[in-house]
UniProtKB/Swiss-Prot annotation:
It is found in: Nucleus. This is DNA mismatch repair protein MLH3. The gene is MLH3. Disruption phenotype: Reduced fertility and meiotic defects: 60 per cent reduction in crossovers and delayed prophase I progression. Expressed in reproductive tissues. Heterodimer of MLH1 and MLH3, called MutLbeta, which is involved in correction of a specific subset of IDLs when associated with MutSbeta. Signal peptide: none annotated.
Length: 1155
């Protein structure tokens, strides 16, 4: 074994990567790797999950004494010292020198070793990357190393408890880890033993290859299907085993449920190549190596695989011969062979293995399905040639954008017998696709705003529990596609009319349980000139009549289903009831809108010519916001009986709610909701000239209205599809009024609207409002009151930045702009505002509605948190109704109210106070028998008399205890036996003097210190007994053995630097608190002065024994005097007034103080 040396500083800073020991399997793995690097031929692992112990014994080269000194130190290793020998570093497992150091941080590590040819062995004990013991150990006779880990994760109780709660899982992970290592190192003997059950979990014998190990674990049948591989091509060498040519998959009809195991080709390959061809990713499992160039490596493996499989078997695929491969891999293998013949190095198979969107993946249902594991999007893109443009197809997960642009290059049918990459004989392929259509619930979907997809008819024998369906046929002609540009079909080879019977949209009506079984018919081929395409055509059922249901949860969804499914359990709606449930008496579909109306980007397909490519581009669809007969808003489409006058009265009031939210969404310009989608029927036309004055963006050949980019909101006239037009006023003040009326719980003539918050919930916590005057009164006046009365806004003492904002936001269109400007002028002059009066905000008579709404100023500041009576939703006033009660509070001094706060250049509240300001503090009289006021350095502060005296007594008692005056030793009547972990014995011996000084007297019986044997007898035997003879007595309180263990833990955490045990601190805090002055105790001025003088002498004068503050600064007198000096005249403000200093005034103040 090489010499252990510290890594150079340059190498150390270049790595910057640590090893995290997150479970016991990782600890075992690192120790086994060290044994393999030492050249061991036999490695024995002993594991105890409950006792949190691991022992690894090997017969390697061992460690010399000089190397043992550096062993376990961070950045000390024998495997890597310079970047120039990086080729040799790859031969070892871990070369940063951090494994043993990381293990010693979370456990007690013991290393016993004997080097080859050395007379003596050595022992080293470490904890926290620090050496606790290093000496000679002659118990080991043969060369090798024994590493023992005790008390694993002692500093991480959560991880330790989790590990001990599932010992079987931990043992299984360790067995799996060792098995993986044994496959690579078949010439080494491994054994894993559970010491708690004496059960041998895993054992291997040395062999020349891993074939015997595979035969034992995988079975004879599986091993017989493998063939040996050993091929060298230049710098690459691939050896191992892979599935032979006689492997056959199970038939798709016999696979059963999806949760059962399905057989697939297996392989175990070992790739040997120079170090410069790959890079380590350093991920925790150490199972990932990234090649710099994957192309040659993958191509080399492909050639080996194709060479082992018989050539005639592969050719049978072209003739529909034997089913050698899985159906999903058949076409891929054909393409791979064609590409390999042309000299291509990268197969389309790797492209198809990329991450596909969630909508393209099969649903995780327990359904019968075939072995076709190819992406189901191959039905949409039936071509072998894909164009990867930019980042459209990203290998990252959860990154799928509708901006993807796929060009389908159609091959010449005259030169080749295939169409879009499909075999000319497509019977077998269509059958496999038909099976997939029957078993795949999440079919290839094209859902955004309006979606169509390949779906089942109304006789398939399964229930759609999380999807809704449209059984109305959609007829699309060429002109309609050019006009609307809203339907996104990712199919090619469409005729003038495409008949799709159903539509399944992603995240549509959740919880909708359809009791109608659906079935598939044989797919029909839609023939187009020049080629053919596989597009299933499903027959229609003309007699079905659609219905429309809507639910609200993150958007609005439409569900059109057959009359055969009258029972449909809806998901949770927005307010316990649906928006509307009208009936349709025609086959025409309906388009509805939700509360949060968003315009979603959609994919529009341009069908310029069927012989050309189909491009998918991203646009923003424009909608026609119309007005119904009842004044409701909806998306404009062809006339539908659903929106006729007789049927509209049933859901009129509820639907008007959506109109207001529609106005709000249009005004705010929200970003599109990705889960918002619509369902539509045939002949849907969207008017692109809905709001001509809004900002529009030109995209392609059509103009689309980007509603989220609209900045101008004026009176718009929205054309209705009913043949008439209504004036729709989108006014920001009206929208805000509707919003505030809803949030305040008021009602209007459109019907009662429930609050989003449950009535059974407790009231909101009302935050403290610093900028509202104490004398501010919330009141309302009759609607006929004059808004220009001089006492309307007498006490609007809000801050300068917030006053105008609250006036503009709270006073809606009921208040004219002239009155707002007048209010701003009156607020700007501070002399016109009176000091204390009722605060009233008056609204004039409403013009648009009969319902009059009055809002107080506090409600505008926080409408949701306005005080309401719990369970009754009625306002409760927090101030007295009589104004004279408020005027009687003028004597209360509030430094954050009135003109004093508004005009202050500096805050009246001191930011902090230091201990030096207490030196010359002036003590005033006691307040409320609780506090001691002081004036320190121009700052008025109050001192908690209980907290201050508690701090004084605590430091006095602490000084006595540390001096040994208030503590004694109490001997126990009977010796108490202690059972400590192994680490406890070490700590008890290391810190025995400190423990004895405090009064714990222990009798430690030292037995023979023997080393660990192979059977781990030291872990199974009874720990060394320790008897406790005496305990300390602190201020008359006897401590216990539990306090001793707590002190040991503290010493271990602080490396012996702590002085006072935690139990002693608790006793001192309790005694100081019980003996201190309490609230309600009257104090003389002299006693107050003594408390302040004692507080000055303490080390922590601003904290009590429990950490709470003793002193709080109130007012900065210097800043207060500056502000009072700015007040003109002899005006009295909260009892403060500038007066001339006279003898009479001083005499009167003295008389008042005496009385």
């Amino acid at each position: 074994m090489k010499t252990i040396k510290p890594l150079p500083e340059g190498v150390r800073h270049s790595m910057r990567s640590g090893i995290i020991m997150f479970d016991m399997a990782r600890v075992v793995e690192e120790l086994v790797f060290n044994s393999l690097d030492a050249g061991a031929t036999k490695v024995s692992i002993f594991v105890g999950v409950v006792s949190c112990s691991v022992k690894v014994v090997d017969d390697g080269s061992g460690v010399s004494r000089d190397d043992l000194v550096l062993l376990g130190e961070r950045y000390a290793t024998s495997k890597f010292h310079d970047f120039t020998n990086v080729e040799t570093a790859s031969e070892t497992f871990g070369f940063r020198g951090e494994a043993l150091a990381s293990i010693s941080d979370i456990s007690l590590l013991e290393v016993r070793t004997k080097a080859i040819g050395r007379p003596n062995g050595y022992r080293k004990v470490m904890k926290g990357s620090k050496c606790l013991h290093l000496g000679i150990d002659d118990d080991r006779k043969d060369s090798g190393t024994t590493v023992t880990v005790r008390d694993l994760f002692y500093s991480q109780p959560v991880r330790r408890k989790y590990m001990q709660s599932s010992p079987k899982k931990v043992l299984e992970s360790i067995k799996k880890c060792v098995f993986r290592i044994a496959l690579v190192h078949s010439n080494v003997s491994f054994s894993v033993l559970d010491i708690e059950s004496d059960e041998e979990l895993f054992q291997t014998n040395p062999s020349s290859s891993a074939f015997s190990l595979l035969m034992r674990d995988a079975g004879t049948e599986a091993v017989n299907s493998l063939c040996k591989v050993n091929v060298t091509d230049g710098m690459l060498n691939v050896s191992g085993f892979e599935c032979a040519d006689d492997w056959k998959p199970t038939d798709g009809q016999q696979t059963g449920r999806r949760n059962r195991l399905q057989s697939n080709p297996g392989y175990i390959l070992c790739i040997a190549c120079p170090r410069r061809l790959y890079e380590f990713s350093f991920e925790p499992s150490k199972t990932h190596v990234e090649f710099k160039k994957w192309g040659p490596v993958l191509a080399f493996i492909e050639r080996i695989t194709l060479a082992n499989w018989k050539k005639d078997r592969i050719l049978e695929l072209f003739d529909g011969g034997a089913d050698i491969l899985a159906k999903g891999d058949r076409q891929d293998l054909i393409d791979d062979k064609i590409r390999l013949q042309n000299g291509s190095l990268f197969s389309i198979l790797h492209f198809l293995d990329a991450d596909w969107p969630e909508a393209m993946e099969p649903a995780k249902k327990k359904l019968k399905r075939s072995n076709d594991h190819a992406p189901c999007s191959s039905l949409l893109f039936p071509s072998a040639d894909f164009k990867q443009d930019g980042d459209y197809f990203s290998p990252r997960k959860d990154v799928w954008s509708p901006e993807c642009e796929v060009e389908l290059k159609i091959q010449n049918p005259k030169e080749q017998g295939t169409v879009a990459g499909f075999e000319s004989r497509t019977d077998s392929l269509l059958q496999s696709r038909d099976i997939e259509m029957q078993t795949n619930e999440d079919f290839p979907q094209v859902t955004d705003l309006l979606e169509t997809s390949l779906v089942a008819d109304s006789k398939c024998r399964k229930q759609f529990l999380t999807r809704c369906q449209i059984t109305t046929p959609v007829n699309i002609n060429h002109d309609f596609m050019k006009d609307s540009d809203v339907l996104n079909f990712q199919f090619q080879g469409l005729k003038d009319e495409l008949d799709v019977s159903n539509c399944i949209g992603k995240h549509l009506l959740r919880g909708c349980s359809s009791r109608v079984s659906l079935t598939f018919h044989e797919p029909k081929l839609s023939h187009v000139e020049g080629y053919e395409s596989v597009v299933p055509m499903i027959p229609n059922e003309k007699q079905s009549s659609p219905r429309v249901l809507e639910t609200r949860e993150g958007g609005s969804y439409c569900d059109v289903y057959s009359d055969k499914t009258p029972d449909c359990s809806l998901g949770s709606s927005w307010q316990d009831t649906d928006w509307f449930t009208p009936q349709c008496s025609s086959d025409r579909g309906c388009v509805g809108i939700g509360e949060d109306f968003n315009i979603t980007p959609i994919d529009t397909a341009e069908f310029d010519s069927y012989d050309e490519k189909v491009g998918s581009k991203k646009y923003l669809s424009s909608v026609n916001v119309g007005s119904s007969v009842t004044g409701s808003f909806c998306l404009s489409s062809e006339w539908s009986p659903m929106y006729s006058t007789p049927s509209a009265t049933k859901w009129e009031s509820e639907y008007q709610k959506g109109c207001r939210i529609l106005e709000q969404s249009l005004r705010l310009g929200r970003m599109p909701d990705p889960e918002f989608c619509f369902s539509a029927a045939n002949n849907i036309k969207f008017d692109h000239e809905v709001i001509p004055e809004m900002d529009c963006c030109e995209t392609g050949t059509d103009s689309f209205t980007a509603i989220q980019n609209c900045t101008q909101l004026a009176d718009k006239i929205c054309k209705s599809s009913w043949g008439h037009a209504d004036d729709v006023r989108i006014d920001q003040y009206s929208i805000r009024k509707e919003k505030f009326s809803y949030m305040d719980g008021t009602q209007n003539n459109a019907g009662k609207q429930r609050s989003k918050r449950s009535r059974s919930a407790p009231p909101f916590y009302r935050e403290k409002k610093r900028f509202i005057s104490l004398s501010c009164k919330s009141d309302t006046k009759p609607k006929n009151s004059d808004p220009s009365e001089p006492d309307d806004l007498e006490c609007l003492t809000q801050p300068c930045n917030a006053s105008q904002m609250h006036l503009k936001c709270s006073i809606l269109d009921d208040v004219s702009y002239d009155h707002i400007q007048e209010t701003e002028k009156r607020l700007s002059s501070a002399s016109d505002l009176k000091a204390s009066a009722g605060c009233r905000t008056v609204h004039s008579e409403t013009q648009d509605e009969d319902v009059h709404e009055d809002f107080s100023s506090e409600e505008f500041l926080d409408p949701i948190k306005s005080t309401t009576k719990w369970r009754h939703n009625c306002a409760v006033s927090q101030v007295p109704k009589e104004s004279h009660e408020l005027h009687g509070q003028d004597g209360v001094f509030d430094i954050s109210s009135g003109l004093l706060h508004l005009r202050s250049d500096e805050s009246l509240v001191p930011e902090s106070i230091n201990r030096h300001s207490l030196e010359d503090a002036k003590v005033l009289q006691q307040v409320d028998k609780k506090y001691i006021p002081i004036v320190a350095c121009g700052t008025v502060a109050i001192v908690d008399q209980h907290a201050a005296d508690e701090r004084i007594r605590l430091e006095e008692l602490r000084t006595k205890v540390l001096a040994g005056k208030a503590r004694t030793v109490t001997y126990l009547s009977a010796d108490q036996e202690l059972v400590l972990p192994e680490m406890g014995y070490q700590l008890l011996q290391s810190y025995s003097e400190q423990i004895r000084d405090w009064g714990w007297i222990c009798n430690i019986t030292v037995e023979g210190s023997t080393s660990f044997k192979k059977n781990m007898s030291i872990i199974q035997r009874k720990p060394t007994p320790i008897t406790l003879n005496a305990v300390p007595c602190i201020l008359g309180v006897n401590l216990s053995d539990v306090d001793l263990l707590e002190f040991l833990q503290q010493l271990a955490d602080t490396d012996g630097s702590s002085t006072i045990p935690p139990s002693v601190l608790r006793v001192l805090n309790s005694k100081a608190c019980r003996g201190a002055i309490m609230f309600g105790d009257s104090l003389l001025p002299s006693e107050c002065s003594l408390i302040i003088d004692g507080l000055k002498q303490t080390s922590l004068c601003f904290q009590c024994a429990h950490g709470r503050p003793t002193t709080v600064p109130l007012v900065d007198l210097k800043a207060l005097h500056k502000q009072i000096a700015k007040l003109s005249g002899r005006q009295v403000w909260h009892g403060l007034q500038r007066r001339e200093i006279t003898l009479d005034r001083a005499k009167s103040r003295l008389d008042n103080a005496k009385s």
